[in-house]
Design a protein with these regions (language model features):
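N-terminal amphipathic/basic-hydrophobic helices that include classical n-h-c signal peptides
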Residues: 1-11
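The feature marks non-catalytic terminal segments
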Residues: 24-33, 199-293
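Histidine-centered active-site/metal-ligand motif
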Residues: 68, 179-182, 255
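Short aromatic-enriched loop/helix-cap "lid" or pocket-rim segments at secondary-structure transitions
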Residues: 102-106, 180, 220-225
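Soluble non-cytosolic domains of exported or imported proteins
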Residues: 111-115, 145-150, 179-183, 239-246
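Short, well-ordered beta-to-alpha junction loops that form the rim of enzyme active sites
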Residues: 137-138, 169-173, 213-214
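Active-site adenylate/phosphate-handling loop in enzymes that bind or generate adenylated species
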Residues: 159-196
Length: 293
């Protein structure tokens, strides 16, 4: 006589549970694999993990030099930890009001965008604990056409007043995103530091110049031609630190006119980007051993 236990309700229920557990386990493994594969796109193997780049350098006064409102979104972690962990004095300069930007979503009249984005930048830097922030009036998208001597002189005067020992900015050949305004402000930053050293005054420049570096694999996949330009022209980073992704999400909420920028530019929503990209990467130039000529 055949054993009827195989058709018993309890036996059938047990089989279903076993099947569900197996399926769930496979899904967990697949999701975990996809997660770590995604994280690898934003990993930079040359970078050593540190709690704070500014703390690692012994910085006490930090100046960030940028081109547009929202550029500070690349360095949230560095500035937040410089203030909260290291007690550093922090300052920012943004060269343009971002008036030529594309609104994603549209939140204001286009003719008012410069005013709106200036306010967004000032509010975001305040949210990062930044002590002072100047937004200049140079044309968005036209920084390379501005008289370079004027830009350098203005930055020199600002640096003499702030006296930063760490300056944070863009690598001139890549600008983190390939934007020409970023690249020019990176060049102007180097020229200003060189001029301060040449003048040899009471304040003769910072001890370290820190460049924000973009993750190469992700840029190669999602950054298009500009991403390739960045990958081919930026140096490898020596340091990685927490990106303080909570502050990045807060920053995009503050930058309401650019809130959907990541999805618009790279086809990935911000929540997914920062789930995978939770570190900032930096190349550091020790100006005592490697001065700017």
């Amino acid at each position: 006589v055949a054993d009827g236990s195989a058709h018993h309700p309890e036996f059938l229920m047990r089989k279903r549970w076993i099947a569900l557990i197996v399926i769930a386990s496979v899904l967990v493994v697949l999701v975990a694999g996809l997660y770590w594969a995604g994280r690898s796109l934003f990993h930079m193997p040359t970078a050593k993990g540190v709690d704070s780049v500014v703390g690692e350098l012994g910085g006490e006064r930090v100046l960030g030099v940028f081109a547009h409102p929202d550029d500070e979104q690349t360095v949230n972690g560095l500035f937040w930890r410089a203030k909260q962990h290291d007690g550093a004095y922090t300052a920012m300069i943004t060269a343009t009001a971002g008036e030529a930007g594309h609104q994603v979503p549209v939140v204001a009249r286009q003719e008012d965008l410069g005013v709106v984005r200036t306010a967004e930048a000032l509010k975001n830097s305040f949210n990062l604990g930044v002590d002072e922030h100047e937004v200049w009036e140079y044309p968005d998208g036209g920084v390379p056409e501005v008289d370079e001597d004027e830009l350098v002189e203005r930055l020199v005067e600002a640096m003499k007043r702030i006296e930063p020992d760490v300056v944070v900015g863009f690598w001139p050949a890549s600008g983190a995103t390939g934007h020409k305004d970023h690249m020019e402000m990176g060049r102007v930053t180097e020229l200003a530091i060189a001029q301060l050293k040449e003048e040899g005054g009471a304040y003769d420049g910072p001890g370290h110049l820190v460049y924000t570096i973009s993750p190469t694999t992700a840029l190669s996949m999602f950054g298009g031609e500009q991403g390739e330009l960045v990958v081919e022209n930026q140096p490898d980073p020596e340091y990685a630190m927490s990106a303080e992704t909570g502050k990045k999400h807060e920053g995009w909420a503050i930058h309401a006119s650019q809130a959907n920028y990541l999805q618009s530019a790279y086809y990935l929503p911000a929540w997914l980007v920062y789930l995978l990209w939770d570190e900032e990467f930096y190349h550091v130039r020790d100006l005592a051993t490697d001065p700017i000529d």
